[in-house]
Amino acid sequence: MTNMRKSHPLLKIINHSLIDLPAPSNISVWWNFGSLLGVCLGLQILTGLFLAMHYTSDTLTAFSSVTHICRDVNYGWIIRYLHANGASMFFICLFLHVGRGMYYGSYSYLETWNIGVILLFAVMATAFMGYVLPWGQMSFWGATVITNLLSAIPYVGTSLVEWIWGGFSVDKATLTRFFAFHFILPFIITALVIVHLLFLHETGSNNPTGLNSNADKIPFHPYYTIKDILGFIVMFLFLMILVLFSPDMLGDPDNYTPANPLNTPPHIKPEWYFLFAYAILRSIPNKLGGVLALILSILVLVLLPLLHTSAQRSLMFRPISQCLFWILVADLFTLTWIGGQPVEHPFIIIGQLASILYFLIILGLMPLAGILENKIMKI
């Protein structure tokens, strides 16, 4: 009699995706982040569901409903902080996952990569709308500033902003629709994740060498299930340290002040995971130019397969490209720091130089390094 997991129509899909999946024998810890992202998504949906049971999306009661969750609901404080800091963990894993894809040339799986970029946009949109929901000062002004960027679109900009707001300013209608979208988007993200995995399992996983690994595969279970579980334990350890010891470390103190349209905070800034893009936006004096640079800072990932000039897929054996990659990582840290600073000298010029370097490395220097390495190795 055949094993049920191999014959049952539903279990068969799970078996081919998680148990008997042939995986390269040499994939490193950098391949853990996919499963960690799945766990983060599950955690966010679960904690978000419990928060939604107590939250009210009304401008008069939103702030006090979040306070009520933290003070009066059983374990409400831990659910709220797991959700807020879980988002930070989500983005840490997301950035490392994308970085891994860039380093090891995983972008040559076009469909998987492009769905991944769409997922990145969807997660960023969800996180932005979630940040508006507590209706603190930074929620309100962050929503006002970021939605206002759409007014830079010629001709239809102003109408588009008012349509998104549901009025002439960020108000009750805006909060209600942001809550609705924030609730539905994670389920759309889950559907996209399934498509992402579907495309990945069509080709099989990449590996650190970038070479074909068909000759050397091992079953996913037990080898990589154990490895993934270790990843979960480490991630939850860091998350719980953050939640239980310093839950507000990554938040903004201004968000503990109820939203007031008559009082602007001294420095309007988004959550830390958007600061690099925010710095690129601010580095261009023109509004439309800034918005385009902001979108391009993420959309540039779609161009990576077209910009790949090297005969080798991975950066593992390419020292010049490796140097450029780590300069790019340092540049992103610089942009994140600049995004949190006020718009004054010397931060303006540092931000502008870091923004130029970001696009220069991805669009110019990396492809040139690939050609140079081919020449050096006579490929």
Swiss-Prot record:
Belongs to the cytochrome b family. A ubiquinone binds at residue 201. Heme 1 (or BL or b562) is low-potential and absorbs at about 562 nm, and heme 2 (or BH or b566) is high-potential and absorbs at about 566 nm. It holds the Pfam family Cytochrome_B. It comes from Eospalax rufescens. Component of the ubiquinol-cytochrome c reductase complex (complex III or cytochrome b-c1 complex) that is part of the mitochondrial respiratory chain. The b-c1 complex mediates electron transfer from ubiquinol to cytochrome c. Contributes to the generation of a proton gradient across the mitochondrial membrane that is then used for ATP synthesis. This is Cytochrome b. InterPro entries: Cyt_b/b6_C (IPR005798), Cyt_b/b6_C_sf (IPR036150), Cyt_b/b6_N (IPR005797), Cytb/b6-like_sf (IPR027387), Cytochrome_b (IPR030689), Cytochrome_b_C_euk/bac (IPR048260), Cytochrome_b_N_euk/bac (IPR048259), Di-haem_cyt_TM (IPR016174). Keywords: Electron transport, Heme, Iron, Membrane, Metal-binding, Mitochondrion, Mitochondrion inner membrane, Respiratory chain, Transmembrane, Transmembrane helix, Transport, Ubiquinone. Heme b b562 binds at residues 83, 182. Its main location: mitochondrion. Its cofactor is heme b. One of its GO terms (molecular function) is metal ion binding. Binds 2 heme b groups non-covalently. Heme b b566 binds at residues 97, 196. It comes from the Eukaryota. One of its GO terms (cellular component) is mitochondrial inner membrane. CDD domains: cytochrome_b_C (cd00290), Cytochrome_b_N (cd00284). The chain crosses the membrane at residues 33-53, 77-98, 113-133, 178-198, 226-246, 288-308, 320-340, 347-367. Coiled coil: none annotated. The gene is MT-CYB. PANTHER family: CYTOCHROME B (PTHR19271:SF16). It is a multi-pass membrane protein. GO terms for biological process: mitochondrial electron transport, ubiquinol to cytochrome c. The cytochrome bc1 complex contains 11 subunits: 3 respiratory subunits (MT-CYB, CYC1 and UQCRFS1), 2 core proteins (UQCRC1 and UQCRC2) and 6 low-molecular weight proteins (UQCRH/QCR6, UQCRB/QCR7, UQCRQ/QCR8, UQCR10/QCR9, UQCR11/QCR10 and a cleavage product of UQCRFS1). This cytochrome bc1 complex then forms a dimer. It is found in: Mitochondrion inner membrane.
